[in-house]
């Protein structure tokens, strides 16, 4: 490894904003490594992290309330550039001797700020220039409080009619505050502003690229694993597929994958996984055909939560049985990604090893005494996809819609039966095929069919028949926290419905789910 791609790094301190992970993703997109830590990170940890620049993120609290969070003193003692965003700007102002007050006028949503001062942060960055030569920026605001007195050494950089100090700067110390959110796409020049802070002001080099990340991860895996053997549960999902490709590149035949075919996968999915990894890439994959075991364990159970637990337990049983046939396995690989690390244990220690419950290998480590290998634990989902492409995985696989761990088990309402799973698989295949043909697959974030265990009357030729009902579901979302139902063209829905009813004996009616999240969840169970 010629260079340490973690050497140039930015520290982001989280004060509780819903946008904080977005800041980290934006910094990574610029090509610079960063980590997210809680606002009360200790001074010694901050010094040990040795950031080239620090970003104080937003948060829901009021700076002037008792016990509201403050940036650690080390932030201002390190002599590195600091950018405060929203709450981060307010706490910086307060801590450096300025004043913050509550305001009757909340600013929420789009705003235009006038750039009234000169500073390296915003120089040459604008959306408009008005007749008087004032530069303007279109930004996204979300605040009630505002800075009413600048700390010593600062000047006003930007303002709006209701917020005279919308941005402030002290170019001598390289301290900057912006009241708006540069990390959200609504702030049109946000990427350029963050880029300016990270690359030019903080002096970071853009070393964090997919090619470098792969090289670094391969070296790290080899260093951790040595000549030991590694076991991976391969599901065909994005995370486990990328882990498989990465480990195969790093350690070749020391990797063994177990692919559990639970009978609840998409049409031909098991064969596709085997073709991709075993045949094309030469990965050692053991395929456990466990459809009968899963279906017999699920028989008679209609409660969604219990179904999930049964599927999870059965997975562990099957995985364990296969793993115990293997000799000399020392490591268990997992597709843990950075958001899991952040959520688990508040990422307080930064060392939180958490096994994703939906990988369902919770029963393994204790008995087999395996050490964990988590090569993706520093990466966001969008980075994992880019790494997948870098490793040569096909685009369609890497950008495939999410599929739940329990598979079709939670898309068959009520009891799971083989007959239902077979019908659903075919209906789902038709829906996805038509979405791809009409160029709608990548415009939707998730699309699938739900099997409803109710029969409805249909007319076939001269006769009536009672057959099953299915619902189509397609949503658009940025973060899966909120989602709106996809407004698919009527012609497309008509084609899908016609094909499902005509090609699949046993389904007589197709409905389209027009519920958004909230209140409805994306999956039905």
Swiss-Prot record:
**Name of the protein this chain belongs to:** GMP synthase [glutamine-hydrolyzing]
Q: Which NCBIfam families match?
A: guaA_Cterm (TIGR00884), guaA_Nterm (TIGR00888), PRK00074.1 (NF000848)
Q: Which Pfam families match?
A: GATase, GMP_synt_C, NAD_synthase
Q: Which residues form the GMPS ATP-PPase domain?
A: 208-400
Say which species the protein is native to.
Ectopseudomonas mendocina (strain ymp) (Pseudomonas mendocina)
Give its E.C. classification number.
6.3.5.2
Query: What InterPro entries does the database record attribute to this sequence?
Result: Class_I_gatase-like, GATASE, GMP_synth_C, GMP_synth_GATase, GMP_synthase, GMPS_ATP_PPase_dom, NAD/GMP_synthase, Rossmann-like_a/b/a_fold
Q: Which residues form the active site?
A: 86, 181, 183
